[in-house]
Swiss-Prot record:
It comes from Corynebacterium efficiens (strain DSM 44549 / YS-314 / AJ 12310 / JCM 11189 / NBRC 100395). GO terms for biological process: coenzyme A biosynthetic process. One of its GO terms (molecular function) is dephospho-CoA kinase activity. The keyword Nucleotide-binding applies. The keyword Protease does not apply. The gene is coaE. This is Dephospho-CoA kinase. InterPro entries: Depp_CoAkinase, P-loop_NTPase. It catalyses: 3'-dephospho-CoA + ATP = ADP + CoA + H(+). Its EC number is 2.7.1.24.
Length: 200
């Protein structure tokens, strides 16, 4: 099975590329979705997060208050490391399970949509690494406009991730998403053609 790592910094448009691949029938293993699943009420990771960051990261109904957690977890590299030490081992375990399930089912290619692919050294476990790249100021502009995030918060999150140049060095294929969405679609089509060539 061809393992494709899809990554890019926050606000790069990586999820849009994943959606385009999914629409073509490719299996997407979404690290962010797995990260949400492991902090559902009753999951051990949620209890550990409460222990580490306090009860006020919970909503009244017992679910995780994501902005509340983000406000505490992204204030320093130590706090971000604490968050990652709780969530990342569980994300890795569930990811491995999903890859194994896909392989057992005879899936020819699986796309691992993972923001921290290079940060965690997981690019080395992939057969093909695809990086979606956008200049930092453009990413900030998009995230402030589309998600209503504060500029300082966005820049802190970007700073907590591996620098773009390191991510780009790990890439087999770079998708430049500085332009219009049509340009992104054309590059996604070329990526799809490349994947299909490799799994024939």
């Amino acid at each position: 099975m061809l393992r494709i790592g899809l990554t890019g910094g926050i606000g790069s448009g990586k999820s849009t590329v994943a959606d385009l691949l999914s629409a073509e029938g490719f299996l997407i293993i979404d690290a962010d979705a797995i990260a949400r699943d492991i902090v559902e009420p009753g999951q051990p990771a949620l209890a550990e997060l409460v222990e580490a960051f306090g009860e006020d990261i919970l909503n009244p109904d017992g679910t995780l208050n994501r902005p509340g957690l983000a406000a505490k977890a992204f204030v320093s590299s130590e706090q971000t490391a604490l968050l990652n030490s709780i969530t990342h081992p569980r994300i890795a375990e569930e990811t491995a399970r999903r890859f194994a399930e896909a392989e057992a089912a005879g899936t020819k290619a699986a796309v691992y949509d993972m923001p921290l692919l290079v940060d965690k050294g997981l690019d080395r476990t992939m057969d093909l690494v695809v990086v979606v790249d956008v200049e930092e100021d453009e990413r900030v502009r998009r995230l402030v406009a589309k998600r209503g995030l504060e500029e300082d918060d966005v820049r802190r999150r970007i700073a907590s991730q591996v620098p773009d140049e390191i991510r780009l060095k790990a890439a087999d294929i770079v998708i430049d998403n500085n332009g219009p969405v049509e340009n992104l679609r054309a590059q996604a089509d070329r990526l799809i053609a490349e994947i299909l060539t490799r799994i024939k």
